[in-house]
Design a protein with these regions (language model features):
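Class I (Rossmann-like) S-adenosyl-L-methionine-dependent methyltransferase catalytic domain
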Residues: 1-89, 93-125, 148-149, 167-226
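Internal, well-ordered alpha-helical scaffold/interface segments
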Residues: 103, 139-143, 156
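A short acidic, Gly/Pro-enriched loop at the edge of an enzyme's catalytic core
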Residues: 126-136
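A short glycine-rich, Lys/Arg-flanked "PGG" loop and its adjoining helix->strand segment in the class I
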Residues: 152-164
C-alpha cells in the first residue's frame, strides 16, 4: 500500500470511530445492546478479563506479582476493559485512535490510580512514554482495522515496547469469508492462521498458541523472543 492510501485509511478510522463515539459509544464498543448503565458496561469488561486474563495468569504474569506489572491495552475505547485491567494490575496504559473515545475513557477512569489513556494515530505507539511493558492485550479491536499492514505495524510496535519474554495476547478477525473493503472500518481485514504465524515471525514474536482460526474470535498468544 502506498503511504497516501495508508494515511487515508488512518484518517477514516479516526473519523469513523469519533462519529461512533458521539452517536453511541457503548453500543459500538459492545454491540449486544443499545443502552448500557455504567454498571452493565464495566461489568462486561470484567467478564472479558475474567475469561481471557484471569484464566491465563501463568502465561501473562510468568511469576510476577500482577500488582507490580505494567500492562498495555490496544484500542481502549471508552475504558470498558481498561477499568477491569486496573483492578488486577498495578499500572495500565491504553491507546485508541479516537479522541472522542479517549475523552470518555479519561472521564470514566479518573478515579483509577495508575491508569493512563492516550490518543494515538491508529498504527503505532509513538505517543507512549519511554516505558517497558510486562503484558499487552487487545480484544475486539483488530477485527475493525481495514488493513493487514496496519495490524502488522501495531504488532511490531507492541514488540518494541514489551520486555523480553513478555506476552501480547490479542484477538483478530479469523473468518476469511467475510467481504471487506480497504475503507471499511467496521468489518476489518481477516487474518488466516498462516498469516498470523508469518506476522509473528516477521515482528520478532514466537506464536506459541493460536485458538479459533477461521472464526471471528481468533486468539493469538505472541511471546517476545529474548
Amino acid at each position: 500500500m502506498n503511504p497516501i492510501g495508508r494515511q487515508t485509511q488512518l484518517k477514516k478510522m479516526e473519523a469513523d470511530w469519533d462519529r461512533r463515539a458521539r452517536e453511541n459509544a457503548r453500543f459500538y464498543v459492545v454491540t449486544g445492546q443499545t443502552e448500557w448503565s455504567d454498571e452493565e458496561f464495566f461489568q462486561s469488561g470484567r467478564k472479558t478479563v475474567e475469561e481471557e486474563i484471569l484464566t491465563d495468569m501463568t502465561n501473562i504474569c510468568q511469576g510476577k506479582d500482577p500488582r507490580q506489572m505494567r500492562v498495555l491495552e490496544i484500542g481502549c475505547g471508552a475504558g470498558r476493559i481498561t477499568r477491569a485491567l486496573s483492578e488486577t494490575f498495578g499500572e495500565v496504559h491504553g491507546v485508541d485512535v479516537s479522541g472522542e473515545m479517549v475523552d470518555l475513557a479519561r472521564r470514566a477512569l479518573a478515579d483509577r490510580p495508575g491508569v493512563h489513556v492516550y490518543k494515538n494515530n491508529g498504527m503505532d505507539l509513538s505517543v507512549l512514554p519511554d516505558l517497558e511493558f510486562d503484558f499487552a492485550f487487545s480484544c475486539i479491536v483488530f477485527q475493525h482495522i481495514p488493513s493487514r499492514a496496519i495490524i502488522e505495524n501495531y504488532v511490531r510496535e507492541v514488540h518494541r515496547v514489551l520486555r523480553p519474554g513478555a506476552l501480547f495476547k490479542f484477538q483478530v478477525q479469523g473468518c476469511a469469508e467475510i467481504e471487506t473493503s480497504p475503507d471499511d472500518t467496521w468489518l476489518g481485514a481477516p487474518i488466516t492462521d498462516q498469516e498470523a504465524v508469518r506476522m509473528a515471525e516477521r515482528c520478532g514474536f514466537e506464536p506459541r498458541y493460536r485458538i479459533g482460526a477461521g472464526e471471528q474470535y481468533f486468539w493469538l498468544w505472541f511471546f517476545k523472543k529474548g
